[in-house]
Amino acid sequence: MKHAKKTRAPWILLACLAAIALCIVAAVTLLQPNANPKNIEIPGTRGNIPATIQLPAKSARGEELPLVVLCHGFTGNRQGDGHFAPLAEDLAANGIATVRLDFAGCGDSTEPYANYTLANMAADVDSVIGYIQATYGTGKTALVGHSMGGRLASLYPQLGQYPVTALALWSPANGTGLQGLEFLSIDNFAAVEEMAARADAEGSVAAWGVELSAAYIDGMRDSDPNATLQESGLPVLLTYSGNERILSDTTQTETKAAVESLPDGQVVLDPFVNGDHNYTSEDPATNTQLDADLRQVTVDFLTSHLQ
């Protein structure tokens, strides 16, 4: 019996060491900052929506995973001028899931640009939120929107199907009605009005190398994103750069006033005085700093309201 105990002891020790090693591996895995981004297609109301999801490597037990939807701007794509992927990494490291999508006619979307309307964009956001909730059990949801994506995010509490907890707006094109299209001809608004009239008469109008539908023009004309922000009462982060150029001072002033009137409205301008509308710069060091600052203020805001 004594001899048998001696022969089993090394095996017991080895088994214990193996168990400890597995625990260490599991712990290291859980401490990884995030999971890899995954490109998928999400079923939508008009066909599949090209999207990229990124999930945290772990989430707190018993708690729903927060979700952020990243909305790109006019003629943009789900890269968000290079800001969305690193932002998704940062949010994943903070326990927040993200989904970024290509709207109709943009990026990998196979739809014609004529389907790019505010109503269709809101429907696409509905589809991706519903899909991510059903698939991953996400809970609190926020939107980040740049430029026209910021206008959409501002309007989503009115147009969308799902409740949202907070909004982060990067240089939103929030001019009232057709003023939201001022970027098409910032120095001559009469030209914008002429484009709108042509779309009304002919069903569409060409601008910036794409075809704008009468439905898109109508949606812009009938919307007032700053009024919607004030009605929603949601926490809102607003940023503008120092060199917007394609957005008027009037639009910026009115949008700042709308956000500042909110109980949890936050306007951040100083870090971006040397950036353009896309938060970029020709100077590499400035460009890097702009991206870092944009992500930092956004992550700080979102984590404070989603966790």
What do the PLM-derived regions correspond to, one by one?
Residues 76-88, 103, 250-251:
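The serine-hydrolase catalytic nucleophile loop
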Residues 136-147:
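Alpha/beta-hydrolase fold nucleophile elbow
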